[in-house]
């Protein structure tokens, strides 16, 4: 049962690209750039719940900050949680996280740890339980398109896949919301999506699945038992043509009218990340 104040909830999903300015700029002021983009996002979306991916924690490349905490504080959201997918830095040296449950960092346990990279959430709704789900990784990498350093055009680089995880928050209002960042390797991401959706179906309350699923053309709605609540391109941020980022609810809840949603328009460019945020206002019957 969903209870007040969650009869209406504004949910955002945002692949952060660790706060990288787009186009890239020399000597980026990482903390201030993230604060500025977050403040702009919060004014535009007025979120109750933010799902974030490609988040840094104490990384030298992004000014050694806890990006999840910075986003929560500058969005006016009291509760937050961060789950590392790896210790180290993607694309460089890293190792897998052996105990995901013990590696969660929240507003009540923000202690110095090794630098890491992963996913996070921030919300104004009290969190009563956090769960994690390992989703595995691809043994092969893929060429990915990234912006050129001079900000003009894009280039391909070969990227190895890293372990994929999901962070699931059960809220006091009865909702269960998951965030994840699935593999960019075709087929592997479908396997991960099905693994996560099966896990979520066993949890209590209405379930919302969010994140960068790396699947275009509304494929997640066709395969997972969850239905996308907004169809809008989110990638690349400098000229969106493909939807990789989703906010989804159980297909049965959407079909029965228990859940409906309205897209929140993105009225401004945030000037960070190669993904644009996606936001919906969800209504619960």
Where are these regions (language model features)?
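Surface-exposed cleft-lining segments at the edges of enzyme active sites
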Residues: 22-27, 55-56, 137-157, 179-186
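Active-site flanking residues adjacent to catalytic metal/cofactor-binding acidic residues
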Residues: 14, 53, 180, 210-212
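N-terminal, active-site-proximal structural segment of metallo-dependent hydrolase catalytic domains
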Residues: 1-116, 190, 194, 274, ...
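Short, P/G- and charge-enriched loop/turn segments at secondary-structure junctions
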Residues: 104-111, 153-157, 232-236, 264-269
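Alpha-helix-centered segments that form part of catalytic cores
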Residues: 112-118, 152-165
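Beta-strand-turn-beta hairpins that frame and shape the catalytic cleft
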Residues: 3-12, 119-133, 142-146, 160-179, ...
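Residue-level detector of structured alpha->beta connecting loops
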Residues: 46, 76, 124-126, 204
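Metal-dependent phosphoester-hydrolase catalytic domains
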Residues: 129-134, 185-208, 213-285
């Amino acid at each position: 049962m969903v209870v007040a104040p969650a009869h209406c909830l504004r949910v955002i999903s945002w692949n952060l690209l660790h706060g990288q300015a787009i186009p890239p700029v020399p000597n980026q002021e990482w903390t201030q750039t993230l604060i500025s983009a977050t403040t702009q996002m919060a004014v535009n979306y007025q979120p109750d719940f933010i799902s974030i991916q490609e988040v840094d924690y104490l990384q030298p490349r992004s000014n050694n900050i806890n990006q999840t905490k910075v986003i929560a504080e500058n969005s006016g959201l009291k509760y937050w949680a961060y789950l590392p997918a790896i210790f180290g830095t993607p694309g460089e040296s890293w190792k897998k996280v052996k105990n995901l449950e013990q590696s969660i960092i929240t507003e009540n346990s923000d202690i110095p740890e090794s630098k890491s990279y992963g996913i996070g959430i921030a919300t104004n709704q009290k969190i009563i339980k956090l769960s994690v789900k390992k989703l595995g990784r691809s043994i092969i990498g893929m060429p990915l398109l990234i912006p050129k350093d001079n900000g003009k055009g894009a280039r391909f680089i070969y990227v190895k896949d890293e372990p994929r995880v999901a962070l699931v928050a059960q809220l006091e209002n009865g909702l269960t919301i998951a965030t994840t960042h699935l593999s960019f390797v075709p087929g592997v991401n479908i396997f991960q999506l099905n693994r996560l959706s099966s896990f979520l179906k066993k949890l209590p309350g209405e379930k919302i699945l969010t994140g960068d699923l790396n699947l275009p053309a509304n494929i997640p709605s066709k395969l997972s038992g969850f239905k996308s609540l907004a169809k809008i391109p989110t990638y690349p941020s400098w000229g969106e043509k493909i939807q990789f980022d989703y906010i989804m609810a159980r297909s049965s809840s959407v079909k029965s009218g228990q859940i409906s949603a309205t897209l929140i328009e993105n009225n401004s460019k945030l000037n960070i990340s190669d993904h644009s945020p996606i936001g919906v206002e969800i209504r619960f019957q």
